[in-house]
Amino acid sequence: LSARSPQTGIFALGTSSHAYLEFDVVGPHGLELLEAVASLREPRTTMGGINLVAGFRPELWRAAAPDDAPAALEGFNADVTGVDGFTMPATQRDAVLWLSGGAYDVVFDTARAAITALAGLGTVAEETSSWPYLHDRDLTGFVDGSENPTLVEAPGIVLVPEETPGAGGTVLLLQKWTHDAAAWEGLTAAEQEQVIGRTKPDSVELEDKPGTSHVASTDQDQFGHIFRRNMPYGTVTDHGTMFVGFASERRPLEAMLESMAGLASGERDALTNYTTPVSGAYYFVPSIESLLEVSSTTSP
């Protein structure tokens, strides 16, 4: 087997407009939906300047390509329930399309074309649009992704290794977090910094950060390294963060969620007092070659 190529949109930084479409299968058409999503791409990696990243519920991918599925990878099939009843809901869907581009009109038109192409096989269960805020900050006003690996490092961290099932693919955790803006903005900047564990202007990690700070709760040296493509979403009155995290296996992502929920320490991430997860799904994002194989081998 020659080396497998990741879907290019995973690492396409700098795009200013994003859409996330999560699909439920219509009736018995799971494999047809998967084939149709894979065929949206064909060999081209961009459509009209749009990056298109396709992922699938792990169990659905395994049904289509059993030899090309990471062992034991499962969807987000059960809520993560932490201390004091705090819950991260499981809202696993069958397929996801993440579109990104330089302007929302082309993202919109491409998303509409994709939905039309999948009509009768999959219905849109969740649709969210995102856009950058103050370059690389989320709607808390803090820099998001300070610990991200560089683009040189990221593939080696988040791609399934060569010569193992799923090579060149990656595991995506997609979660929508809605912010309690009034409560957050009721804090002073110094109080916010204690919640996050970093300085607000320049994102320097605090020496004496609390153990419940977001930085301490999601320490990648402890849980494993991931690559995040988080983006703000929403309106002035209803907004938050799309968590878009990639890893070579599910465990680092899952361990961070469990830590944030307080399952490790008994105390949950202080940030979860101000932001609430409303969705959660794991998707396998296959290599370009794997998508081509599925789109061609299952076609008549």
Residue ranges and their predicted role:
Residues 1-300:
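Long, histidine/aromatic-enriched segments associated with O2/redox biology
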